[in-house]
Amino acid sequence: IGMVVECKDGYLMGPDGCKLDCLMRKGTFCAETCSLRKGKDGYCYAWLACYCYNMPDSVKVWERATNRCGKGK
């Protein structure tokens, strides 16, 4: 019996609804943070934001359509 687990890629979101920044963080910050959120791997995209691979669908990622960054809560 096989089981299919949905996974997604995307930018991690901070509590403010913005992409999780990585500019002034150690080089392994994104990979470690993605791993903590059950993602397979991640990296700091253009030294600006953490991008993760193979995360569970339950993890919220930044999406242009639902962007609330800088718009209050």
Curated annotation (Swiss-Prot):
Sites bearing Lysine amide, chain numbering: K71
Keyword field: Amidation, Disulfide bond, Ion channel impairing toxin, Neurotoxin, Secreted, Signal, Toxin, Voltage-gated sodium channel impairing toxin
Coiled-coil zones: none
Record-annotated disulphide pairs: C18-C69, C22-C44, C30-C50, C34-C52
Signal peptide coordinates: 1-7
Molecular function as annotated in GO: sodium channel inhibitor activity; toxin activity
Tissues of expression: Expressed by the venom gland.
InterPro entries: LCN-type_CS_alpha_beta_dom, Scorpion_toxin-like_sf, Scorpion_toxinL, Scorpion_toxinL/defensin
Additional facts recorded: Negative results: does not affect the cardiac Nav1.5/SCN5A, the peripheral nerve channel Nav1.7/SCN9A, and the voltage-dependent potassium channel Kv1.5/KCNA5.
Free-text comment on this protein's domains from its UniProt entry: Has the structural arrangement of an alpha-helix connected to antiparallel beta-sheets by disulfide bonds (CS-alpha/beta).
Family the entry assigns: Belongs to the long (4 C-C) scorpion toxin superfamily. Sodium channel inhibitor family. Beta subfamily.
Its job: Beta toxins bind voltage-independently at site-4 of sodium channels (Nav) and shift the voltage of activation toward more negative potentials thereby affecting sodium channel activation and promoting spontaneous and repetitive firing.
Name listed for the protein in its UniProt record: Toxin Td3
Organism field: Tityus discrepans (Venezuelan scorpion)
